[in-house]
């Protein structure tokens, strides 16, 4: 069976994770595998916490793209991979990994573009980072203004032109979600 790869891109807080999770809920983990792009941040064990806090995590160079590409190839070849786990509280990869099994469909959170209003995205990011990642409001706002917003304008927003599908509001857009689900169903039936 040929594997279908679905890439999901969009700005911070746009709904990429929600959309990916809803695809998995629709089919189950035996049919759909997810590689979460954030887990592929490079390790920086050589730096102290304060230095890691100052890194620009929104530039493409922040990611271990070679490892991500290797894992995609392995999954497409039917092999399982151990996806790294990024720990937001220490601004570094943890020693843990998550086993990701090969499946007919691989969702890569990084040619679907999730387009959500900038005000909604920043509010979602603030809520998520403060509640789930233990960040302070000041640190989230400072990071947004110094790296997130400029990198979004330089790298994320231009990638929208390359998308096959642009989904307003991410996983909350039921019509778009159903369209993706139907595409995946068709792929699974043809296999």
Regions from the PLM with identified roles:
Residues 5-7:
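Short hydrophobic/aromatic beta-strand immediately N-terminal to the Walker A/P-loop
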């Amino acid at each position: 069976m040929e594997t279908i790869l679905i890439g999901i891109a969009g700005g911070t807080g746009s709904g990429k994770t929600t959309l990916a999770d809803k695809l998995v809920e629709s089919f189950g983990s035996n049919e759909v595998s997810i590689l979460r792009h954030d887990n592929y941040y490079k390790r920086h064990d050589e730096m102290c916490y304060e230095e890691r806090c100052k890194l620009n995590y929104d530039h493409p160079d922040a990611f271990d793209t070679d490892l991500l590409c290797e894992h995609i190839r392995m999954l497409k070849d039917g092999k399982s991979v151990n996806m790294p786990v990024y720990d937001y509280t220490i601004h570094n990869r943890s020693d843990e990994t998550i086993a990701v099994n090969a499946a007919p469909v691989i969702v890569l959170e990084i040619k679907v573009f999730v387009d959500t209003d900038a005000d909604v995205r920043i509010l979602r990011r603030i809520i998520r980072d403060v509640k789930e990642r233990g960040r302070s409001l000041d640190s989230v706002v400072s990071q947004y203004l110094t790296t997130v917003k400029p990198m979004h304008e330089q790298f994320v927003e231009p990638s929208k032109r390359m998308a096959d599908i642009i989904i307003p509001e991410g996983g909350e857009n039921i019509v778009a979600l159903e369209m993706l689900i139907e595409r995946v169903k068709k792929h699974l039936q043809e296999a």
